[in-house]
Amino acid sequence: MSTTLRLAFLWVPTIACFAIGCTLSPTQVPARAKHERNGHTADDALVQFSLLAALAADDYAGGAPLRDLLAAGDFGVGTFDRLDGEMIVLDGTIYQALADGTVRAADLDGTTPFAAVTFFGEDGRIENLTAATLDDLDAQLDRKLPHRNLPYAMRISGEFAAVTLRSVPAQSPPFEPLVEVVKHQVTWQHHNVRGTLVGLRCPDWMGTINVSGYHWHFLSDDHTIGGHVLGCEFQNGSLRYDECTSVVIHLPQSTEFDEFDASEVTDEDIDQIERQRAQTSPK
């Protein structure tokens, strides 16, 4: 068996696109490598806009148009201009979970400083999944997902006995680093709510490109509850996953991006920002 790695920079007038493609033999990934979308065939790519390290370093303003995001995928997570809420992309709609606890369909004329999406096509499923905590869920998936070093898009549907969520209010310049912003996050606990966990798992090699490990957002079935997940508890959930066999990164061409220093963003900062967990299972 052989694995090939493709690296390329593709320059267009407003965006630099860094593509990393990992092509595996069919015996390694038996599921289909491409999915049909609107009569077209789309690669199983995780398409990312900017870098987590840039976001952590306070590059919050402007970014890619949300319409461009939907052209790249129908499923994923991210944030909005000036960190104005948590982004959930599900079934081709972008939802904005605001710091006042409301959820709305996002204005597609808006922008995102950071997001990652894919065209979700099921490559496998895990039924009757039960988790007492978010850490319990992550540990189970580490054992059950087929490949350690591929990114995964995952959706878990069911009734959640409890879910702890957060969002942050829109920021104003001069921007603070994200590790300071999350100290002022707003959190909620909800009980006995039906909905979907929308998540990504990125392998360790992705480092400051994205969150290594698991990154979960949540949206209730009635689209009234949503946010970044700090904790959850559920029984008999249905998980579907999509293996992403390539990664495409659209890099901003802004002064803020050009000047940020990735070495100043520590793993401890990323833990505080994106791997934060509720201290106990929600009750």
Residues of each region from the PLM?
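Long, positively charged binding patches that form subdomain-scale interaction surfaces
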Residues: D135-L200, G207-I209
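A hydrophobic, small-residue-rich beta->alpha segment in the mid-to-C-terminal subdomain
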Residues: S220-S263
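Conserved catalytic alpha/beta cores of large enzymes that bind or transform nucleotide phosphates
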Residues: A262-T280
